[in-house]
């Protein structure tokens, strides 16, 4: 029986979304702009990386052709390989959003057909009645922030006041999200998670997709830094996903990284926690060794988005891509006959774009494994085709939204 390994390179978009203008993202292209900056020397950083973007393994899996089909151009400064291995294409998101749950749920065969709730960008972000209920039910004297903000910026700006007053820092972004930053020692991690659970219950009526706990440590604005104890409190997907269907048919779903949180821990057999792309790859490789016939290993590589995309760090994003590319050889060595690897993304987060938010883009679709014939699958109409292809590979019935490319 077959196994499947689904890797989401969080935010690794390839541009070209036909509805990007509706999201203020016309022209956004995460891969294309990173390559362009690197080719021009703007992706160099002493001691980290220099020169054109170099992704030889991903290129041999069709990344150059994917970029051209999605955005109409090859990435600058990157050689085109003589031969491509495996299946390659791009996918267009049909969900109404450019957020993490929408992208992942659609990848798993369940597009989001409803509109998320969002908070206003002008004035106070949160309704007064929400803040009053949250402070009352969670037992705090008030909150700080109450605005749209970058997570690292608001910690630097309000972290010392948070320590002094004991008030959690609450903020949002262009996503359907309520984020809470608090000091792990002065406020306490358990207290932060309990606060977020209260917020999750109150925010359902506002149709907010996620509450995110953002713990940090440090003593002053110059030393504050986030820890690896982030946790997402998501609403449930609107209908059964690929993960639920696999469980229903007696298979195992191994969720590596934040996958469990994204799916509200539904359709998960086993959670494997790890922080940072390198540790996530280590955990994924170990899980591949342990996976049985019929299993799915599902990993989100979060650093591309959280550490580099939102912070608009081109050299950091480029270096992370190159490090991931180098480790694909370790994945190749572990594959057995019948295995399928799928590489994709959930949205874009162009590090050259204005602001700090996600960008609406198409995503790459790469599928390979022993016996997989190389071919182009063009531009798919929905991310859901990915989930349906995995369903077919693992021998379970098709779902209602996507079409398999296998």
From Swiss-Prot:
Q: Broadest EC class?
A: isomerase
GO annotation terms (biological process): 2-deoxyribose 1-phosphate catabolic process; 5-phosphoribose 1-diphosphate biosynthetic process; metabolic compound salvage; nucleotide metabolic process
What does the entry list as the binding residues for Mn(2+) 2? 305, 310, 358
SUPFAM superfamilies per record: Alkaline phosphatase-like, DeoB insert domain-like
Q: Which GO terms describe its cellular component?
A: cytosol
Q: Do you know which InterPro entries this protein is assigned to?
A: Alkaline_phosphatase_core_sf, DeoB, Metalloenzyme, Phosphopentomutase_DeoB_cap_sf
Keyword Cytoplasm tagged:
yes
Keyword annotations of the record: Cytoplasm, Isomerase, Manganese, Metal-binding
GO terms, molecular function: magnesium ion binding; manganese ion binding; phosphopentomutase activity
On cofactor binding, the record's note says: Binds 2 manganese ions.
Quote the catalytic activity from the record: 2-deoxy-alpha-D-ribose 1-phosphate = 2-deoxy-D-ribose 5-phosphate; alpha-D-ribose 1-phosphate = D-ribose 5-phosphate
Q: Where in the cell is it found?
A: Cytoplasm
Look up the EC number in the record and give it: 5.4.2.7
Residues annotated to bind Mn(2+) 1 = 10, 346-347
Q: In which pathway does it act?
A: Carbohydrate degradation; 2-deoxy-D-ribose 1-phosphate degradation; D-glyceraldehyde 3-phosphate and acetaldehyde from 2-deoxy-alpha-D-ribose 1-phosphate: step 1/2
Q: Identify the cofactor(s).
A: Mn(2+)
Q: Which family does it belong to?
A: Belongs to the phosphopentomutase family.
Functionally, this protein is described as follows:
Isomerase that catalyzes the conversion of deoxy-ribose 1-phosphate (dRib-1-P) and ribose 1-phosphate (Rib-1-P) to deoxy-ribose 5-phosphate (dRib-5-P) and ribose 5-phosphate (Rib-5-P), respectively.
Put simply, this protein is called Phosphopentomutase
Native source organism of the sequence: Rhizobium leguminosarum bv. trifolii (strain WSM2304)
Encoding gene (name)? deoB
């Amino acid at each position: 029986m077959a196994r499947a390994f689904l890797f989401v390179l969080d935010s690794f978009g390839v541009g070209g979304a036909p509805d990007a203008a509706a999201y203020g993202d016309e022209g956004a292209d995460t891969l294309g702009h990173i390559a362009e900056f690197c080719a021009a020397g703007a992706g160099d950083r002493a001691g980290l990386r220099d020169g054109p973007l170099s992704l030889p393994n991903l290129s041999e899996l069709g990344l150059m052709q994917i970029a051209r089909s999605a955005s109409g151009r090859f990435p600058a400064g990157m050689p085109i390989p003589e031969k491509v291995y495996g299946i390659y294409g791009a996918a267009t998101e049909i969900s109404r959003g450019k957020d993490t749950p929408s992208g992942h749920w659609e990848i798993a065969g369940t597009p989001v057909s409803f509109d998320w709730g969002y908070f206003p960008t002008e004035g106070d972000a949160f309704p007064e009645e929400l803040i009053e209920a949250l402070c009352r039910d969670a037992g705090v004297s008030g909150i700080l922030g109450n605005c749209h903000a970058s997570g690292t910026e608001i910690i630097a700006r309000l972290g010392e006041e948070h320590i002094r007053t004991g008030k959690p820092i609450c903020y949002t972004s262009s996503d359907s999200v309520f984020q809470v930053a608090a000091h792990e020692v002065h406020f306490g991690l358990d207290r932060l998670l309990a606060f977020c659970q209260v917020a999750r219950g109150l925010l359902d009526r506002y149709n907010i997709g996620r509450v995110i706990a953002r713990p940090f440590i440090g003593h002053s604005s110059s030393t504050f830094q986030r820890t690896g104890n982030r946790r997402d409190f998501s609403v449930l997907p609107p209908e059964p996903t690929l993960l639920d269907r696999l469980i229903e048919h007696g298979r195992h779903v191994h969720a590596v990284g934040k996958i469990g949180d994204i799916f509200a821990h539904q359709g998960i057999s086993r959670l494997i926690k790890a922080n940072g792309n390198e540790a996530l790859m280590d955990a994924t490789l170990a899980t591949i060794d342990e996976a049985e016939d019929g299993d799915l290993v599902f990993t989100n590589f979060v650093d591309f988005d959280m550490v580099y995309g939102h912070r608009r760090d081109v050299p950091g994003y480029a270096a992370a891509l190159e490090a991931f590319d180098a480790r694909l050889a370790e994945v190749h060595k572990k594959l057995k006959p019948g295995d399928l690897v799928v590489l994709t993304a959930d949205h874009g987060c162009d590090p050259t774009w204005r602001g700090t938010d996600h960008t609406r883009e198409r995503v790459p679709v790469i599928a390979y494994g022993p016996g997989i014939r190389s071919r182009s699958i063009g531009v798919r109409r929905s991310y859901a085709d990915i989930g349906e292809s995995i369903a077919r590979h693992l021998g379970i019935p098709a779902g209602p939204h996507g079409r398999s490319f296998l």
